[in-house]
Curated annotation (Swiss-Prot):
Binds together with bS18 to 16S ribosomal RNA. Belongs to the bacterial ribosomal protein bS6 family. It comes from the Bacteria. One of its GO terms (cellular component) is ribonucleoprotein complex. The gene is rpsF. Residues 94-138 are annotated as: Disordered. PROSITE patterns: RIBOSOMAL_S6 (PS01048). CDD domains: bS6_chloro_cyano. Residues 106-138 have a biased composition (Basic and acidic residues). The keyword Ribosomal protein applies. It comes from Prochlorococcus marinus (strain NATL1A). InterPro entries: Ribosomal_bS6, Ribosomal_bS6_CS, Ribosomal_bS6_sf, Ribosomal_S6_plastid/chlpt, Transl_elong_EF1B/ribsomal_bS6. This is Small ribosomal subunit protein bS6.
Length: 138
């Protein structure tokens, strides 16, 4: 018998729903998967992002990613629940060859640390600067 396939479901929620409701959606869809005897490997909230084009008159959306392992029948159940939800504006499920490594979410703190790093100043003077100093001494 072959190995159980891996799946990754990415869905976009309306941008105007509160964070508590986003968490309840994540728990709801994880529970649907667990009820159909599927192992939820990872769930990540990717945050609010601008959409490439408007979807249902929304220019932004809250991205959520679910990685799961199962027999494939759970995908239809999960996607049906998402299709019936008014809060989900788009979803997609992709079959993976194996478990994907969990990407580390980038935080604003990491970005500010990168910006704060300044190049060291070169204390030696270039020949052009030395000539200017000599001219000013005369």
């Amino acid at each position: 018998m072959s190995e159980t396939p891996y799946y990754e479901t990415m869905y976009i929620l309306r941008p105007d729903i509160p964070e508590e409701e986003v968490d309840s959606h994540l728990k709801k869809y994880s529970a649907i998967l667990e009820k159909s005897e599927t192992e939820v490997l990872d769930s990540q909230m990717r945050g609010k992002r601008r959409l490439a084009y408007p979807i249902a008159k929304h220019k932004e959306g809250i991205y959520v990613q679910l990685s799961h392992k199962g027999n494939g029948q759970q995908v239809a159940t999960l996607e049906r629940a998402m299709r019936l939800s008014e809060d989900v504006i788009r979803y997609i499920t992709v079959k993976q060859d194996g478990p994907l490594p969990t990407p580390k979410p980038t935080s604003k703190e990491d970005e500010t640390e990168k910006e704060e790093v300044k190049p060291t100043e070169d204390k030696t003077e270039s020949p052009a600067q030395e000539e200017k100093k000599e001219d000013s001494k005369e």
